[in-house]
Amino acid sequence: PNGILIIPADNPTGLQMSQNTINEIAKICVEEDIWLVSDEAYRNIYFSGSGPSSIWQISNTDVPGILGRRISIESVSKVWNACGLRIGALVTDNKMMYQKVRSEYTANLCANVIGQYVFGAVAQMSSDEIIDWYSSQRAYYSKAITSLIKELKKELPGIILSSPGAAIYIVLDFKNITPSDFNVSKFIEYCSLNGKIRIKKKYYTLLL
């Protein structure tokens, strides 16, 4: 079986794929009889007024035949701030796929214990509590991103910055402020060996 993999809230560009684009891709999947797989780790971190973009926003009226073709990759690492736990889920509206995946990974995988506790705790939350959490996360990241962009422009006049529509990534373009012989590889090597940043009187390694 074949499929198309999409990332509606992109890492590392911060671009948000429109729902209309996802619907058009879904039509191709129906026409070609293939799966539509979507990495939705950042689904609820969006900054546009259009809301989240997701394969689960597609109705059978929008794309006849889409039911039973969708698989989403879910994770607690992003929206739930649990990057080290490495736990998530595959969600599908295809019963056969669900049964096969459950059989395969029950035998082959076991998530870490603390990750299971966290994921289990999320399952006990009400819909309203989860929606409130998503809203608080968007507000937090929106403020942080706006502040970061402002400070970067102040400290590095001429730098080109993207403004994310979703996820938590900003693309920095240094072409207007670096010399013509600037070597990216050497800069990254320097940062990994010597780079550090001071935050609240403590120094941290600068990773790019």
List where the protein language model places each region.
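PLP-dependent class I/II
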Residues: 1-208
